[in-house]
Design a protein with these regions (language model features):
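A residue-level marker of the well-folded mature domains of exported/periplasmic proteins
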Residues: 2-7, 13, 23-358
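Bacterial Sec-type N-terminal signal peptides, specifically the leucine/valine-rich hydrophobic h-region
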Residues: 18-21
Length: 358
């Protein structure tokens, strides 16, 4: 990957996409490699804006932690807007400008193997973030246990349906088919449903995790299975929100239990309103901080501490928590992930009061 053509393309992308970075410490900065003091530039490449978390949580939390650990470090942030080609250009640009570490949450985890290879060819360590890249080992991986997440939300839903003595089957609304993390969640979702009395009525891999595409698909399934839908296992809060919207638009009342994942504000509001059954609390601060710590360790010439290995990549995997109306106050508000002022607005104020959230 050190060919002339690659260098020309990368430099061109750099000029077009980002401009020139200030010389703030390069990979051969001796002070940053002696284990005493880090300096340099970390590229932080996020996948999309379909989920609000990347702009509102991941970016500021990562940047804050890097600043705490390394005053002289700079973060180069880019969002791929759900376009793998755009993210490839952003990565090429960062590599051409000589970033010291690349943190990557891939739009397309298969296509992003090229990004990993290109960076490593320039001796730039790559930290895969949230979504694993299965076909090309990165230098480090930080995430929550995605397969475990899928199993947890599905088992939680099955337990709820059993308690309600529900009949019928389930709609399975998975994440993006080009996201390896989504495939792990999907595997867990299926495992969580297996052995229950609830048949999987239909399954859907949601392109780009797009909530509208999930909503459109669920609307189509309602015409086929309307009276047989006991619930829906949705892979994240975006697809869960799309599922809820489709069920409400079809006049299904009450809305059957629907799962989610990410604990977005809108999902917490739906849980409080009784429109979504569960979500997953996986505080972004945990993975953002872990990724920042790993990046700064690489800048110091150190190896980040791994607790396991996944897809031949040293990894840190954290355990999340299921959130329902029963524990939302404790998990979300008492732990100050969100405040009542952020969530208990307008129509949600009464539900918050009922749950003791103030």
């Amino acid at each position: 990957m050190k060919t002339t053509n690659f260098r020309i393309a990368a430099v061109a992308a750099a000029v077009l996409a980002l401009g020139t970075l200030a010389a703030c410490g390069s990979g051969d900065d001796s002070e940053g490699k002696d284990g005493d003091k880090a300096s340099g530039t970390i590229a932080f490449l996020m996948p999309d804006r379909a989920s609000t978390r990347y702009e509102e949580q991941d970016r500021p939390l990562f940047e804050k932690k890097v600043k705490e650990l390394c005053e002289d470090c700079k973060v180069l942030y880019q969002n791929g807007d759900g376009d793998p080609n755009k993210q490839q250009q952003q990565a090429n640009s960062a590599i051409a400008q000589g970033v010291d570490v690349l943190v990557l949450d891939a739009v397309d985890t298969k296509a992003a193997a090229t990004i990993v290879a290109n960076a490593q060819a320039q001796d730039i360590p790559v930290i895969t973030y949230d979504r694993p890249i299965t076909t090309k080992p990165a230098d480090f991986y930080v995430s929550f246990d995605n397969e475990g997440i899928g199993k947890m939300i599905a088992k939680s839903l099955v337990k709820k349906l059993d308690a309600d003595q529900a009949d019928g089957g389930l709609l399975m609304v998975y994440g993006s088919p080009t996201d390896d993390a989504a495939q792990l969640i999907k595997k867990g979702m299926k495992a969580g449903v297996e052995g229950s009395k609830y048949e999987m009525l239909a399954e859907f891999d949601t392109p780009d995790w797009n909530p509208q595409k999930a909503q459109d698909w669920v609307s189509g399934q309602i015409t086929k299975y309307r009276d047989d839908i006991a619930g829906a296992v949705a892979a994240n809060d975006g697809t869960g929100g799309g599922t809820v919207a489709a069920l409400k638009a079809a006049g299904i009342d009450p809305v059957p239990p629907v799962t989610g994942n990410d604990a977005e504000v809108a999902a917490i509001q739906r849980i409080i309103a009784g429109e979504q059954y569960n979500t997953i609390s996986k505080p972004i601060s945990i993975v953002a901080s872990a990724a920042a710590e790993a990046a700064v360790a690489f800048l110091k010439g150190e190896e980040p501490k791994a607790d396991t290995e996944l897809f031949d990549t040293p990894s840190q995997l954290f355990t999340p928590e299921v959130v329902t109306a029963e524990n939302v106050k404790k998990v979300i508000f008492d732990s100050k992930i969100y405040t009542a002022d952020q969530v208990c607005t307008g129509a949600y104020a009464a539900g918050c009061k009922k749950l003791g959230i103030n």
